[in-house]
Amino acid sequence: MLDVILVIIGYLIGSISSAIVVCRAMNLGDPRQGGSGNPGATNVLRLAGKVPAGITLLGDWLKGTLPVLLAWLATEDPVVASAAGLAAFFGHLFPVYFRFQGGKGVATGLGVILAWSPLALLATVVTWLAVAGAFRYSSLAAVVAFAMAPIYMLWLSASPVLTAATAILTAAIVWRHRENIVRLAAGEESRIGSSGS
């Protein structure tokens, strides 16, 4: 029963949209109605600048990390920790509080990976930074970094359970970025720092 409660808590925490909460609190409007329409830190950066985007990023990151840490502390079971992390992640993608219309999951996914394996998180972030720095596309950096994340998890945690859970994150993030991938292929994707959608 505790396992189920931890998973439900993870989903409910993940369903809190940091972008919407931050933008409402700062009277910045609804991020779903401007820019790319995605309620995430990158779109908040485009619409409102670095400070609101930074707060959004931190909120999205923490809501991935905290449910996993709670599950580790309560059970010390990697299966429960994996389930709680995935619940938080899918809560971000499909939030019950916002008609199941959520973000793309990058920051929350990174927060989950942090709690699963800090070393795998470090490798994933370094990959994101390298790709983003070289090409200036946030979406490309996210797809490449998460494509590598299961490999990093297997290498650095040696946990088949956590590796499988990371692969699920990867598949979902690639799917959520499918429109970005089409725009990248067409040369129409907005670069980091641009004001486009």
Curated annotation (Swiss-Prot):
GO terms for molecular function: acyl-phosphate glycerol-3-phosphate acyltransferase activity. Its EC number is 2.3.1.275. It catalyses: an acyl phosphate + sn-glycerol 3-phosphate = a 1-acyl-sn-glycero-3-phosphate + phosphate. The keyword Cytoplasm does not apply. The chain crosses the membrane at residues 2-22, 53-73, 78-98, 112-132, 152-174. It is a multi-pass membrane protein. One of its GO terms (cellular component) is plasma membrane. PANTHER family: GLYCEROL-3-PHOSPHATE ACYLTRANSFERASE-RELATED (PTHR30309:SF0), INNER MEMBRANE PROTEIN YGIH (PTHR30309). Catalyzes the transfer of an acyl group from acyl-phosphate (acyl-PO(4)) to glycerol-3-phosphate (G3P) to form lysophosphatidic acid (LPA). This enzyme utilizes acyl-phosphate as fatty acyl donor, but not acyl-CoA or acyl-ACP. Probably interacts with PlsX. This is Glycerol-3-phosphate acyltransferase.
